[in-house]
Structures are given as structure tokens and as C-alpha cells.
Amino acid sequence: MNVSSACGECETVLQSVSAAVVADESFLETVLTAVLAEGHVLIEDVPGTGKTLTARSFASALGLSFSRIQFTPDLLPGDITGTYVYREDEGTFTFTEGPIFANFVLADEINRAPPKTQAALLEAMAERQVTVDGETRPLPEPFVVIATQNPVESEGVFPLPAAQKDRFLVKTEIGYPEPAAERALLRARTRREARTPAAETVLDADGVRRLQAVPESVTVDDDILDYIVDVVEQTRTDARVEVGASPRGTQRLLEAARARAVIEGRSFVRPVDVTTVARPVLGHRLIRTTDATVDGTGTAEVLDDVLDAVSVPTVRAEDGEAPPTEG
């Protein structure tokens, strides 16, 4: 599959999902960027904004198997990974797969489960395999996790440590729809019998795997690589940041920028691809200083200043395009 074909597939997927989910286009593109880059998504938003529907709709549009794990304080690692069950008639133990064995996994309210259970999910995300009783089992491919958490409630939750947040390619939010979009949501509800809309299936697992291979063919100039390094370095030297983005964050920024270029139908990365994905890719990887937190300085504000402080390179024209003029 070439970039042009991949771009067309991406447009088809977004159209299918947007028919079911009332959300800003940039949010849906951020989730698709993570899927293309073989990453995972953390959605932090209040209840009722469509987090679960988003996960189901993407799984349906992509033709992938889907499972939902409701995280609770009493959830055990085995409830996620699966366990061995003794078969009395056979006199043997048989492994029963847990809900993690799906292409698209929704980890709902991930911060409600204790750290040990969270760690079981994070291991699966990082290694794409699970280990039960010393036996390692690979997870199906493609494998994407969308985890959600509610930013409002603080009682009975176990906040994700920075090291675990770092495993997510992007962190994003849906937000409330515009009044016009919300009216359209109500009109659509009156025209269907089902309580929940469904996205049309437009791909399958093999198609998704071919789609995920395309970003690796996207060209990245040395100037763009330098730009990515400079942006990440700026997060580490900003006085309001105690801990900046890690080298893993640098690599994820590159991967997301390449995926973004594919969505835009380009075979090369432009600076605007980097700036577009920088906030969802880097925001959750920064730890602000105590003073910045007390002052109410958010990571979005820090990243805006970081991007303003770094010189934007001029990339050579390709594919008949005029040279970009960002910055």
C-alpha cells in the first residue's frame, strides 16, 4: 500500500467513525494517528462525552475484534490476562484467555484499579504479550489499547505514575460538542431505533496491518529530525518543567509525525506534522514544577511556548509542492 492509497483509507475510516461519534475532527485524527503509529491512546474526559463509543466505533470501522475492561478496585491481573482453569473431565488445566486478547481493547476508568492490575495492562501494551504462570502468550495483531479516566473524581482512584503514562503514544480529550453538533446528535437519535449508533466496517485486520506499515516509508529530512530533537530538548530546559520528555518521547514524536503525514497524503514529514502531534504526544510526558502547578500553568501552555521558542526549519519541496512556509 502506498501513501496515496493509505490516505484514502484513512479518510474512509474517519468518515465511518464520524458518522457515529459527534466529536471534533482533530480528536478523531489524533486517535487514528495513534492507530497508524501502532501506539495506544489515553483519553481523559468527563463521563458521557463519547469515550466508549469512540473506541467501539474505531474497532468497528477497522474491522477489529473489540473488548471492554471495566477497571474497579477489586479487579485482579488475571481478570485481564486470563487464567488456567482445571478441567475435571480431562484432568488438565486449560488456559482461558482474558479480555486483553482482542485487537482493540477499551480499558475503562483505568485509574480505578490498583497499581498491580494497572501494571498487567501496561506490560501487555509495551510487550504486546502477557505472561501467565511463567508462560508467555502473544497478543493478536494489530493491538491497540484505548484507556480512559475521569479527571473530575479524585476519591477511590489510583493515579497513573509518570512511567506508565509514558507508555501511551497520545493523551487527548473529546470535550463538549458545539451546540450545532449537539443538535445534530439529537436529530440523528430521532431517526434511528438503536440507542447507540454504529460505525460501518471499512477495513479488516490485514488491511490495518498494511496501513500501519505505510508510515515507515515516509521520508524525514535531517532538518526535521533536528527540529524534533530541539523541541524535546526545550521541554527539558524550560524552567516550569521538572522532568521533560524522555528519549522514548522523542521517538514517539517522530512516529506520530510520520503517521500524521500519511493522513495528510504526503510521503514526507513537514514541520506542521510535528507541531500538530506535539501536544498530544508530549503533554502527558512532562512533569511540571511545584511553582508551575500552583500558578496554574498547564502543560498545553508550556508546549505552546516550547514550540514558539524553537526555530521552524524550511523543508525542500517534494511531489510538486511549493516549499512550506510554517513559522
Language-model features: locations:
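C-terminal engagement/docking regions of AAA+ P-loop ATPases
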Residues: R56, T237-G327
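Pre-Walker A (pre-P-loop) alpha-helix and adjacent loop at the N terminus of AAA/AAA+ ATPase modules
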Residues: S4-V41, V46, R236
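Walker A/P-loop
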Residues: V35-P73, P77, Y86
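Conserved alpha-helical scaffold flanking the Walker A/P-loop in AAA+ ATPase domains
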Residues: V31-L32, Y86-L106, E135
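Walker B catalytic acidic pair
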Residues: D45, D108-E109, A120
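P-loop (Walker A) phosphate-binding loop of NTP-binding proteins
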Residues: V46, I80, T148
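Canonical AAA+ ATPase core
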Residues: R87-E90, A113, T117, E127-T201, ...
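Conserved C-terminal "switch" segment of AAA+ ATPases
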Residues: V3-C7, A20, V157, I174-A245, ...
